[in-house]
Design a protein with these regions (language model features):
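Glycine-rich, acidic/polar active-site loops that bind/position phosphate-bearing ligands
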Residues: 1-198, 204-524
């Protein structure tokens, strides 16, 4: 016909029993609720610690947000050893290196296509993971395995931010496939190697009658204070409620596999503001950090580092803004100065607080991984969940936090419970029907490869491997295997036991792979 053809994607809402129940509507309601409540608070109490902003001039609240998309790209049906990846990562051979060949072509095309969709791509670059591409005898790239990141302009509409993130994933995958490359957005596609995050930025601004926009997180003097009273309150609110929020951010085993000590993967509920207001924080080991430019107050925002490419950005932003508002409400109504609020945020473990948990610390300027032991991290910032079930319990065991998050019915309690139920169901299905079968395939593949029975070292090493294989996967008359016990626990609804067995399974599989590699390297 000569007419253009293509796919039209229209973001939509879902109504059930005359009620909107979808993620987009939850985010819209949450922003509408926070906007109305914050405007009312400002009208009644003013803006403490912000004398440069006249409260009676504020006519609207603007929510700024943005996401960063990390992903792995590879040639189909070609493999690279984990050891090669691990060594390259430790040497940081790929971080911010120039892209080459097909990967460069696809990355440039993806950035250009994002621009054509109006997303205003800002940057595409290599991340820490990956190895140098290998060429075949004809000079073509035969093996590609690299980690990349693409960023685009922030939005003043959180719904647009989340819509853009979904659209960007689709575009990136299609462009790289057009160039013969596979893309994965999994949080931890390769255990032991850097995973992919989706750092989520958020801020709150006020529009004045004059049309001017001011950043409510920025203080009057950027060189004397790191953040305004409302900015301090916002991070207090997020950190206080994060245990109940966490299941909505990291809802899968894959996402939790990424959140372990290592390459900038946050494991502790803690923030950093910077050692001095004149020097912005560069701490990349914390959960949520203050991002600021001393010469540009409009740039002040927070960066939540725990989300991954498959995090539901709609519900994540909804809970971020609701929890931040609760802290901002405390900052406005408590009568405390900015210095007092910052001191409260910076309290030590055991120090009482009017808003935060007495038995927690919430701020550090130190490296969370290098400067604290595991025991110190647990004592100061709480124990990070190791499984989806442990994460769900953070929601179930904190009803007072959930009640706050459900305020105004923007994200109603029954909808939260429904999300949690779906997270639990997915955990069980993936564990029983994907992770355990995959581990079983790995166990079956680790067979004896030595033929010289006179070598006692080989015999001993494979005997250790075989003992682990039998413990993990082989039932006998007097003992069930670990895999069987885990499946039984899931079927019986014994989720505490299943969670413990999953942790044991992960540890045993790691031990098995290490022992088998040690055995195999001695074979000629």
């Amino acid at each position: 016909t000569g007419l253009p053809t293509g796919t039209l994607r229209i973001p939509a809402f879902l109504m059930h029993n005359y009620r909107y129940v979808d993620s987009r509507s939850i985010l819209k309601r949450s922003c509408d609720y926070v906007r109305a409540e914050l405007l009312a608070l400002i009208k009644e109490h003013g803006l403490p610690g912000m004398p440069h902003v006249k409260a009676d001039e504020v006519v609207d609240i603007i929510f700024t947000s943005a996401t960063e998309l990390e992903f792995w790209v590879k040639t189909p049906s070609r493999t690279v050893t984990k050891k090669e990846l691990s060594v390259s990562q430790k040497l940081q051979e790929q971080y911010w290196q120039r892209t080459h060949g097909t990967v460069r072509t696809a990355l440039e095309q993806a950035v250009e296509r994002l621009d054509r969709y109006g997303m205003v791509a800002e940057m595409g670059h290599k991340e820490v993971g990956g190895v140098k591409a290998k060429l075949d005898e004809d000079g073509h790239e035969a093996v590609v395995l690299e980690q990349l990141e693409i960023d685009w302009k922030f939005s003043n509409n959180p719904l647009q931010t989340a819509d853009n993130e979904l659209q960007a994933r689709i575009i990136v995958r299609e462009v790289f496939r057009e160039n013969g490359l596979d893309v994965t957005f999994n949080a931890k596609p390769i255990i032991g190697v850097a995973g992919s995050g989706e750092h989520t930025h958020f801020g709150v601004m006020a529009k004045l009658k004059s049309g001017k926009v001011v950043n409510l997180f920025s203080p009057e003097d950027m060189r004397k204070e790191s953040a305004s009273s409302l900015g301090i309150g916002a991070i207090m609110g997020l950190l206080k409620h994060y245990e109940a929020i966490n299941p909505f951010i990291s809802s899968t085993t894959d996402s939790l596999n990424r959140l372990k000590p290592g390459f900038e993967a946050p494991v502790c509920i803690v923030t950093s503001l910077g050692t001095d207001p004149s020097e912005p924080s560069r701490n990349r080991t914390i959960l949520c950090g203050l991002i600021r430019d001393i010469d540009n107050p409009m740039a002040t925002r927070y960066e939540l580092r725990s989300p991954n490419p498959y995090t539901n950005t709609y519900t994540a932003l909804a809970l971020i803004f609701i929890s931040a508002f609760d802290g901002m409400k405390y900052a406005i109504t408590s009568g405390k100065t900015q210095a007092q609020l910052e001191a409260e945020l910076s309290k030590e473990v055991g120090e009482t607080s009017d808003y935060l948990d007495t038995n927690r610390a919430y701020r550090t300027e130190k490296d969370v991984f290098d400067d604290f032991t595991q025991e110190e991290r647990n004592q100061m910032f709480g124990v990070a969940p190791a499984t989806v079930w442990e994460n769900i319990k953070g929601y179930q065991n904190n009803p007072e936090l959930v009640e706050t998050l459900a305020q105004g019915n923007a994200f109603a309690k029954d909808l939260m419970d429904s999300f949690i139920a779906s997270i639990l169901k997915r955990w069980k299905l993936v564990l029983a029907n994907r992770l355990i079968p995959n581990n079983l395939d790995t166990v079956r593949s680790m067979v004896a490869i030595h033929t010289d029975s006179r070598n006692s070292v080989d015999d001993k090493r494979f005997a250790e491997v075989n003992d682990l294989r039998f413990y993990l996967a082989k039932d006998s008359d007097d003992r069930k295997s670990l895999f069987t016990r885990l499946i039984d626990a899931l079927n019986d609804g014994e989720y505490d036991l299943a969670s413990q067995l999953q942790i044991e399974m992960n540890d045993k599989m790691e031990e098995l792979e290490t022992k088998y590699a040690n055995y195999a390297k001695n074979i000629f």
